[in-house]
Amino acid sequence: MDTDVVKGKILQLQHYSVNDGDGIRTIVFFAGCPLHCRWCANPEGLQVKNRILYIASRCVGCGRCTAVCPRQIGCDLNAPGEREKCIGCGACVTACLEHARKNTVTEMTVGQVLEWLEKEMIFFRESGGGVTYSGGECTQQPEFLHALAQSVYDLGLDQAMETSGYFSLEKLQATLDLMDLLFMDIKHMDRDKHRQYTGVDNELILKNIAALGAQKKNIVVRIPTIMGINGDEDNIRRTARFVKQHIPNPRLELLPYHSYGADKYRQLGLSYEESAFRRPSEEELDLLKKIVEAEGVEPVSFR
């Protein structure tokens, strides 16, 4: 395979991570996602198209960005009417000396990603680590994902995938067979509430988890736990029972809600419903873990 031919849209490569799998890892964040979770911590990853983050506190109003912009957008990218004109070319990012603007998406070849990974091989080998594919939603770019995963597999590295589960299993099967671990989200067990909060129902997601469980894949189900949304005892219990029924080695990770992505919403000119979401307290989280255990499912943490 020519690793310089297949290209993908990447949000970032996060190096030396100790989350989302065993050992020291590089996490490859793919652009694009079919879900639109209202609490999403990575709103820049919802689209494959490049968008510009505008950090207003760094802007000095020098006008360099406007001078190179093909649409003559002013310094304040989030001023009324300006965002709509932006084509995401990134010329303003290059021109800005104050780093007040950032691209959200970078196009990379498989070979370019591998070059980064090869620099970190000693850390992967010594720690039992590897590569984790995340996003956005990594399965939104199936050709690039498979080409990269096959190359990493050929290097003998551990591979994990963090996914919403909203994909065509038939199209992704060959790629999934290369994975050592699958992190699969269940945002909510109620179909209508899942659609209300993410934009899609959960039918395909649950179907895929059940099918991959029947294949005896190594799966950890994750719940982004948000009080008032899906952190109630009934939803956690229903999720644990589903996991117990369909996954041979049932494990479930409760990921407490955080608002780390709030600044990104502002930098993209978007509103953020922070007041609508609440992080579970330690006492609430302990109670939910006990419910998971009572259903015969192991609570785990990769954080």
Label each region the model flagged:
Residues M1-C62, T66:
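Flexible, acidic/Gly-rich N-terminal and inter-domain linker regions that tether
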Residues M1-D22, T225-R303:
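Auxiliary Fe-S-binding modules of radical SAM enzymes
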Residues K9-L11, D76-L77, E162-Y166:
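Short gly/ser/thr-rich secondary-structure transition/capping motifs
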